[in-house]
Amino acid sequence: MLTFAEEIMLLMLDDDGLFLPIRGGSVEHVLAGAVLMDLAFANRIDTDPEQLVILDRTPTGNPMLDRVLARIAESDETKDTKSWLETLAGQGTTEIRRQALTSLIERGILESQDERFLWVFRSRRYPTIDGRVEREVKLRIEDALLSDDTPDPRDIALICLVDACDFLRDIFSEREIERATPRIEQLRKMDLIGREVGRVIAKIEESVMMAMALTPH
């Protein structure tokens, strides 16, 4: 089973293995939320509107998750989910990205290709080797949004993350998005971490828009 961060990284790549443009400032919070979700599903943390607490300090065996688990366990301060999202995102999520991509490469799902011109490094692509995994992730999202069946809790959590960074528009047509909007709004309320990710990103975008409006032209 892939982690949420690995699934998000797959969805962030286009057909050429390049990263899609996403909403400004959202990727750090989405990846931070992805790790918190995996820790919650692994019964290492519990969340409620008031606080995020450690249930079990035992390492999961996944370095990406265990690094964040240790960070939370070492904290002397009690924080809620929103505060931890902002803390983890503020510290940067480069290591989360690196570990997620490394795992996908080691599993044979992606490969890493460096593009060079006259021996000068220009960019790195991550083309898909095994497209079945990405198709399965997208199919789960499609089934959860476009059917009347009760979604799996992991699929609800994933949809909340994908919705927060506006990736649904890269998966569905405008007509499908319009049809699924009531369902999306319903699922947003069913996962606390995903809901907080969406709120934090919306707040960031609101601040950016206000700053732009106040900037002299």
Across the structure, where does each feature detected by a protein language model lie?
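Short, structured motif recognition centered on aromatic/hydrophobic residues
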Residues: 36-39, 100-104, 157-166
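Hydrophobic, aromatic-enriched interface-forming segments
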Residues: 105-114
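Glycine-rich, aromatic-bearing surface loops/beta-hairpins
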Residues: 125-217
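Short, amphipathic alpha-helical interaction segments positioned at domain boundaries
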Residues: 56-98, 106, 119-158, 168
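Short, amphipathic alpha-helical interface elements at domain boundaries
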Residues: 1-92, 199, 205-217
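Short, Lys/Arg-rich nucleic-acid/phosphate-binding segment
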Residues: 49-52, 114-119
